Amino acid sequence: MLIGSHVSSTDPLAAAEVEGADVVQIFLGNPQSWKAPTLRSDADVLKATALPVYVHAPYLINVASANSRVRIPSRKILQQTCDAAADIGAAAVVVHGGYVADDNDLEDGFQRWRKALDQLQTDVPVYLENTAGGDHAMARRFDTIARLWDVIGETGIGFCLDTCHAWAAGEGLIHVVDRIKAITGRIDLVHCNDSKDEAGSGRDRHANLGSGQIDAELLVAAVKVAGAPVICETAEEGRKDDIAFLREKTSG
């Protein structure tokens, strides 16, 4: 099982070595900006490495939005991110589900997601990530994810399970992998994060493993059953220990 972390984009391979990571995730630009990613000077090095590199798309992306001033730039930067990810030989691009203005717009939001994927031109796999909060989110509640997947599942989109987000969404982590796989048929990547807040809080505040509100054994169980590469999106101080903890608990 590949276990690693989200690291600084400055020198991801060096960071992986320091943290003992088998796999890394990076941003290719400012995650809070609409500015397109710039080409990396180390693109050839990253493309040649045996270490899988995942890319997290900007947080601003919301292809489900009815607001064209949000939706159209979202589609554009998703395409630009996928293009930049291809340039470094990325394993996949991870993107949040986004949201709509109210529950009456959910079905249209699902269709906007489908249109965005149909228009996307890339050979890099794209993974939808479940999110922590939002009353009208596309990927917070599992029942809503199921409705979205009915519309987009056949496009070949993958799924990234974030443990903190599932906890914050109020979904809990008992049998979480089985429940998601019953919807999507797949889990391609796990973001293994503890949570600083109580279950159902709707707050996306990650904690190092064992230092938050989630029973560490539930995190280990989810990682084991998922059988997918794992990324710890936790604080740099303690992240090396998070990787070592998961590696010890999942070995053998």
Swiss-Prot record:
Keywords: DNA damage, DNA repair, Endonuclease, Hydrolase, Metal-binding, Nuclease, Zinc. Zn(2+) 3 binds at H165, D204, H206. Zn(2+) 1 binds at H56, H96, E129. One of its GO terms (biological process) is base-excision repair. One of its GO terms (molecular function) is phosphoric diester hydrolase activity. Its cofactor is Zn(2+). Zn(2+) 2 binds at E129, D162, H191, E233. SUPFAM superfamilies: Xylose isomerase-like. Binds 3 Zn(2+) ions. It is an enzyme of class 3 (hydrolase). It catalyses: Endonucleolytic cleavage to 5'-phosphooligonucleotide end-products. Its EC number is 3.1.21.2. Belongs to the AP endonuclease 2 family. HAMAP family: Nfo. Endonuclease IV plays a role in DNA repair. It cleaves phosphodiester bonds at apurinic or apyrimidinic (AP) sites, generating a 3'-hydroxyl group and a 5'-terminal sugar phosphate. This is Probable endonuclease 4. It comes from Mycobacterium leprae (strain TN).
